[in-house]
């Protein structure tokens, strides 16, 4: 770098600001420290905020698997910043990331569509990336470095400096970004006086009642419910209790090691839930060799890891004295200093075969011989380790100190040459030179004519038919999705990607989307839900930006009871609900709009029908649902604030009594995937009959199950007033709407459950031929009354891209 040339600044996006995470140290902190010696500056961050791109010349995302990473990569490409993704695990191995919030492979594939280059620590992993990702994507190999005490301290200091800067964030910024403040301002804008008073009273109760409970010495009625295990990241679900310092030297089983025992050291992650054998289990694979060595020599097996229970189950029963030490970087160094031989077994499955030589190099540089399974990463060290038979290798080192000395002498020079800080800096400089000199170009950005915006889980079923129509007609179409949607409903990432349309994930702020520049090709933008309400701010901000850019904008009626169109209450007063989209595509005749809908809104409305597919793919129900028995679905609404306690009690009591009265029928209560009133907000006690199941979306067995996917399994549907009534009616199912004391003329002629007896009457009618047919006929009549027949998706696409169409989608 010349004296006049501006120093490079690299932004390192990490999974967390935690120097204890191996990938953070080896793949980011050690490289940035090496590059700093070469005049390259760096900043590290774990946030996906676009602000982090300011002032950097390249973005390196290090083994991070979130929707924010996709959004940040897109934003960087748009700004002309090269995106390099550094990956040290084979995320495409079977069951990798099992239990993770979002499938890592899905995230990596999306970033691979636009990344400038990928970097891996081994050739094996590089080949996997070339096979799995887009053709022509450059993949480079930068090996793991060698961890030393001073290097680890410098890495920890780098993280601490970053955290300290975050702690100095001004108080005014924290107040400005407060979710409670934002919700209150929204309520003032859209609620009635009665609605505002009710919400404030509820807020005050939830804040003050726990305080009162503590003063009175009783349990709080609004104590927060513990997070379900299925919602916790895998690392939290499968984490052993750390050993106390006094426990670190315990020999669990077998005869205690003698004071003069030679120490055989293994250290690393205990394992994972993905396919293959990985972690401590690798020692068990070499059980015969270890036990034979223990019979012939005075040895101790020392395991430094992060799962004491797994050690007790797998390692302690082996016929060799053994000791468990809870993992930390400092304890690894302590045990390494005392070791005689380091063991690096490898199962050589699809995941493990791609691992680097970092443990082997660390041991050799510390002056300890290594016995290892031969893997491609260890080929350069083949003449200074024992690779192969573990019994022979361990025996040689225990009996031949000259061999140990010779191997260590070769290894230290070799490791410094291959994995030292100078080597790491050189490898990274080559990558940075390539991506910055335009030898490599970022993937061509998509040039769509139509942009579809997805923000909530229910948006997916609207978008897929629209994508299909656009693609059939040769119209370039793209999907812009929110990071919050993918974080909250991870399966939506794969569902949208499967539509075949290019997917862009957008970052968000408290005020909405971080809207990128619209490509010149864009002629129209369609949101599924666009109002001035908080849940729609992401879509609404994109609509506003498109309007300013002179692009045609549209939005959809997204529910049968749609705020601002067909529904009003004290929190969502219809006169205060506004739509910024120029066109609003509604399902039925305009006479079905709410009588108080504003004239401004009415003039934007165009009747097209419902674009959601009536027939949907049949989902697989969990094994907990008995086979061979009829199933009835009971659906809760997204907006449970609309109902009083009397209605809620009527709904829950009725469902429970119904299940007791019909023991041969399985009833599945399906909470709304976005609302989840019964599973996350209900404060009462639930005592349910065995044949009444709750399809909790937070549980792995129910995750991703939508109402549409359930319908093909059902004999009938009972629902609170909601779109599910229409969805079920469209596929010809008998439907009952739980009315209680609500006036629901808009659901005529569907069956209304207004009394306790009506619950049982409806269920009995489901299995009586004559009465069932009457219910099916009522469903058909309901659909005919509220939905315009025909291809709604085609009409919407035509309206958006052809301004010469009249209100019915026909050429003027």
Question: Would you name each region that the model predicts?
Answer:
Residues 274-281, 329, 340-365, 372-381:
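Nucleotide-sugar-dependent
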Residues 401-437, 773-799:
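A charged, aromatic-enriched C-terminal amphipathic alpha-helix characteristic of glycosyltransferases
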Residues 112-139, 146-159, 167-172, 221-243, ...:
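A short, active-site helix/loop in glycosyltransferases that binds the activated sugar's phosphate group
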Residues 154-155, 386-406, 412, 754-774:
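C-terminal "capping" alpha-helix adjacent to the active site of nucleotide-linked donor transferases
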Residues 11-38, 147-316, 320-337, 459-463, ...:
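Conserved catalytic-core segment of nucleotide-activated headgroup transferases in glycan assembly
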């Amino acid at each position: 770098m010349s004296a006049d040339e501006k120093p490079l600044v690299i932004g390192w996006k990490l999974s967390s600001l935690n120097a204890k995470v191996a990938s953070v140290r080896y793949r980011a902190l050690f490289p940035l420290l090496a590059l700093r010696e070469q005049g390259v500056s760096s900043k590290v961050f774990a946030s996906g905020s676009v602000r982090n791109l300011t002032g950097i010349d390249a973005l390196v995302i290090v083994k991070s698997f979130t929707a924010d990473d996709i959004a940040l990569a897109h934003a960087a490409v748009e700004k002309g910043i090269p995106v390099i993704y550094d990956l040290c695990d084979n995320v495409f191995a079977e069951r990798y990331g099992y239990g993770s919030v979002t499938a890592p492979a899905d995230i990596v594939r999306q970033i691979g569509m636009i990344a400038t280059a990928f970097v891996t620590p081994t050739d094996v992993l590089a080949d996997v990336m070339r096979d799995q990702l887009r053709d022509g994507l450059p993949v480079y190999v930068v090996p793991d470095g060698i961890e030393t005490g001073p290097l680890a301290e410098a890495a920890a200091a780098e993280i601490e400096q970053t955290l300290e800067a975050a702690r100095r964030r001004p108080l005014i910024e924290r107040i400005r970004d407060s979710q409670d403040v934002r919700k209150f301002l929204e309520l003032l804008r859209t609620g009635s006086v009665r609605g505002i008073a009710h919400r404030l009273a509820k807020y005050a109760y939830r804040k003050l009642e726990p305080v009162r409970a503590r003063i009175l010495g009783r349990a709080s009625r609004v104590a927060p419910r513990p997070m379900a295990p299925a919602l916790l990241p895998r690392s939290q679900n499968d984490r052993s209790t750390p050993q106390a310092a006094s426990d670190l030297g315990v020999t669990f089983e077998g005869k205690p090691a003698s004071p003069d025992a030679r120490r055989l050291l293994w250290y690393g992650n205990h394992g994972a839930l993905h396919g293959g054998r990985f972690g401590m289990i690798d020692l068990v694979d070499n059980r015969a060799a270890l036990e034979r060595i223990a019979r012939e020599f005075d040895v101790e097996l020392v395991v430094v890891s992060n799962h004491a229970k797994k050690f007790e189950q797998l390692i302690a029963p082996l016929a060799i004295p053994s000791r468990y030490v809870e993992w930390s970087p400092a304890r690894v160094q302590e045990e390494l200093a005392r070791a005689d031989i380091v063991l690096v077994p490898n199962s050589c499955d699809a995941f493990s075969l791609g691992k680097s030589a970092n443990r082997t190099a660390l041991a050799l540089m510390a002056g300890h011989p290594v016995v290892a399974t031969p893997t491609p990463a260890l080929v350069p060290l083949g003449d200074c380790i024992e690779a192969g038979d573990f019994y022979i290798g361990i025996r040689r080192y225990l009996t031949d100190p000259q061999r140990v000395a010779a191997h260590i002498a070769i290894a230290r020079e070799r490791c410094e040459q291959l994995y030292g800080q100078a080597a790491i800096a050189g490898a990274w400089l080559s990558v940075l030179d390539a991506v910055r000199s335009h030898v490599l170009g970022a993937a061509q950005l998509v040039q769509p004519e139509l942009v579809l915006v997805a923000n909530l889980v229910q948006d997916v079923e609207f978008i897929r038919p629209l994508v299909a129509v656009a693609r059939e007609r040769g119209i370039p179409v793209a999907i812009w999705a929110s990071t919050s949607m993918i974080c909250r409903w991870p399966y939506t990432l794969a569902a949208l990607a499967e539509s075949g349309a290019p997917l862009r994930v957008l970052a968000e702020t408290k005020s909405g989307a971080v809207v990128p520049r619209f490509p010149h090709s864009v002629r129209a933008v369609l949101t599924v839900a666009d109002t001035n309400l908080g849940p729609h701010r992401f879509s609404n901000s994109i609509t506003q930006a498109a309007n300013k850019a002179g692009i045609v904008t549209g939005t959809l009626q997204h529910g049968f009871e749609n705020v601002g169109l067909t529904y009003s209450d004290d929190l969502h007063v219809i006169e205060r609900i506004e739509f910024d989209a120029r066109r609003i595509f509604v399902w039925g005749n305009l006479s079905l709009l709410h009588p108080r809908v504003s004239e401004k809104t009415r003039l934007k409305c165009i009747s097209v029908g419902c674009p959601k597919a009536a027939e949907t793919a049949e989902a697989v129900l969990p094994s907990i649902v008995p086979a061979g028995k009829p199933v009835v679905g009971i659906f809760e609404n997204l907006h449970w604030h609309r109902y009083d306690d009397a209605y809620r009690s009527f709904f829950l009591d009725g469902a429970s009594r119904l299940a007791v009265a019909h023991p041969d029928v399985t009833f599945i209560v399906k909470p709304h995937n976005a609302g989840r009133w019964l599973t996350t907000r209900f404060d009462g006690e639930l005592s349910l009959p065995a044949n009444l199941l709750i399809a909790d979306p937070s549980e792995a067995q129910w995750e991703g199950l939508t109402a549409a996917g359930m319908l093909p399994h059902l004999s009938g549907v009972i629902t609170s007033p909601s779109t599910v009534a229409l969805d079920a009616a469209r596929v010809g199912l008998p439907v009952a709407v739980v009315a209680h004391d609500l006036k629901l003329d808009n659901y005529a002629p569907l069956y209304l459950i207004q009394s306790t007896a009506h619950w049982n009457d409806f269920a009995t009618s489901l299995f009586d031929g004559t009465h069932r047919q009457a219910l099916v006929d009522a469903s058909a009549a309901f659909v005919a009354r509220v939905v315009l027949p025909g291809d709604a998706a085609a009409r919407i696409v035509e309206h958006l891209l052809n301004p010469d169409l009249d209100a019915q989608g026909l050429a003027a």
